[in-house]
Amino acid sequence: MNVQPDLTIALLPWGDLFEDFHDTIGVSFETFCKELTGSWQFGYIDALRTAGVRTVLFFASEHVSTPSRFTHVPTGATVCVLPASPLHRAVRYTVKHTSFPGLKTLGAYLSTPLGLLARELRREGCNAILCQEYEYARFDVCVLLGKLMRLPVFATFQGGHQQLSRIEAPMRSLALQNCTGLIIATQTEIDRVLTDYGLPPAKLARIFNPLDVKLWCALDRDEARGQLGIPLDAQIAVWHGRIEINRKGLDVLLEAWKHICCERPGRDLRLLLVGTGSDADELHQRIATMQLQGVMWVDEFVNDRTKMRCYLSAADVYTLPSRHEGFPVAPIEAMACGLPVVAADAPGIPDILEGGEASGGLVVPRGDAKALALALGRILDDEAGRHELGKRARCRAEDSFSLQVIGKQLREFLLSHQT
């Protein structure tokens, strides 16, 4: 149930321009507005709405010449797109044609058109600014803007900490000391930030990324398999996300899958991969070279929630072999659909599966294909055990990641720092 909003938050996602990230996954701005769901930002929008907080998304883009407003249809949120400044365009062009040190960092700082942003923040009646990442140039300039406009500035952690350039290092420390608060889901990252930047603990809040567990629920398994043309007696491990081989540990997953199939000859085993990305061509080559059994790959970005639920509902176990994450939503989607999870201990996973098997999953060391194979094999070999873990996973999703639970926590933290 939504509450009448009495607070408005400006949400600024990571990336210099809208097209920098979305072009790499084949998502046009029209598709973004009409169809895209599932990412952390939409979870925040939905969760905050349940707590009476309205969210306005802000992007910069080279595809508009004046501030333009749109509606994100699935959430109803306003999307305000600001034109990139001429100076940023010039620096961006130069970066493509030279290797001048520090120019890329300068471009990142210039990517946020502060004058236009200030005007649109006032127009929307925004009470606070929330940036996707605090170790990024946009956060630094937003803290400055917040001081000038007397607006509190917060930031989340979604996995994007970067190496500091000579320009960024002093700016970052100053911005973190002067921001209002940080929202971090993982205890490991909280400890790192406290150690590296010396921030007072009260400035940090441990709040998980939310998920609409009412919408993310399992379909009938047999019907899902029928739609996908998968035999009812096949055993399926599923993964979905961006195809980035090293970061997402897909090389580890392929090696683990090879072990699993070799140890279980004669069984109909399927590895269902859903997603695309910058390493798609390389992954195709690896799969062909390794001559792996039963790999089914939907090489596209799937933004249809019903279709994604169908893929998850057809599976027996979900796996996340990542080497690095921020706080991944994908395994929570699988848990909400009643799937047990086998995941590498990347940041966020020890928090999501805090109770281990009691939370509905198994955690293995990162980069360890043998350990991943053993854990996945254990789940695939034990039907009763896998069903029990799936029930626990669903309970964990409902109790810890629902919109209502997270929305209340977010509102309390944002309001506790209002002046």
Question: Where in this protein do the model-derived segments appear?
Answer:
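Aromatic "clamp/platform" in nucleotide-sugar-dependent glycosyltransferases that forms part
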Residues: R323
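Short hydrophobic beta-strand element within catalytic cores of glycosyltransferases
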Residues: P340-A343
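Nucleotide-activated donor-binding/catalytic signature segment of Leloir-type glycosyltransferases, i.e.
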Residues: D281-V302
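Donor nucleotide-sugar binding/catalytic pocket of nucleotide-sugar-dependent glycosyltransferases
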Residues: Q162, Q177-R221
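Short alpha-helical donor nucleotide-sugar binding micro-motif in glycosyltransferases
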Residues: C310-A315
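Conserved donor-binding/catalytic core segment of Leloir-type glycosyltransferases
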Residues: P231-K248, L254-W257
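Conserved acidic donor-binding segment of nucleotide-sugar-dependent glycosyltransferases
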Residues: G355-A369, R378-E383
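N-terminal subdomain of nucleotide-sugar transferases
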Residues: M1-V73
